[in-house]
Amino acid sequence: MKKMALMGLIFSVMASGVFGDENDGIFNYKIGQFDVYMIVESQRDGNAGILVGADDAALKKYIPANGFKHTANAFLVKTGKQNIVIDTGTGAGGIVVDKIKKLGVDPEKVDAVLITHLHGDHFGSLQKDGKAVFPKAKVYLSAKELEHFTKTSPNAGAVAALTPYSSQTVTFEPGELSAAAANKKLKEVLPGISPIAAYGHTPGHTMFLIENGKAKLLIIADLLHVALVQFPLPEISATYDMDQKAAASVRRQVLEYAAKEKIPVGGMHVVYPGVGNVTKDGNGFKFTPMK
């Protein structure tokens, strides 16, 4: 079994191709003919205090004595026909936008922005001084997420970020994880990209499955915040999770799916390279970063 798992991991890397530069905070991962870039906006010392229900023994076992890093990431997808941004970071210092430019894409050339959820470290680069940073882009997000953060429990930052895109905002109903696990065809929001519901962190928290040819990558967004602990102990949630019980449940389901189907995952709070393979490890999971 271990040999088969290893071969699956090797095949995933060989089939898709990887390379990157940690100094630049950019990691490129090939999904068939698609180029996916993980972009680091910021990295700082992590805080295990955000974990809910983690005892001292677990923290000591999984977190090094010298601590760990917390990162905030965004993604850029070049399909050959479209330039697609998945989440935009906080907007601090214009870092995400500058790195997108470095990758050869002017903000005016971004065709779509996919928002996983409406927390400030995911929509922050959408607007600057009340104007759209990506003026020609359509902004896609879950209808449930939009309803919650603009009407049910309005968030001023989210409203301000989306206002310049009032005529360019597109909502969707994400597919069910059970359908993906059953290998059913999911409804695409854009060619090669399908949204999948992962509610718990927020009411409309959404993942995106990127597919081209036989290659896949699952953008898990904020499924977890402290990878060192939450991969092996998926029942541990974070204070940021609005529904911690639901977040823990969907976390385990998603990791089971990724491990079983050998689908690499990419996360917004997974340290560089931010992309890797998930395998079963006892009652939890192991994350192996791409190299």
Locations of regions flagged by a protein language model:
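Positively charged n-region of N-terminal signal peptides that target proteins for export
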Residues: 1-4
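Bacterial N-terminal signal peptides
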Residues: 7-15
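Conserved beta-strand hairpin/beta-sheet module of binuclear metal-dependent hydrolase folds
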Residues: 22-102, 207-223
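Active-site environment of divalent metal-dependent phosphoester hydrolases
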Residues: 24, 118-125, 148, 178-179, ...
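Active-site metal-binding motif and surrounding structural segment of the metallo-beta-lactamase
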Residues: 93-140
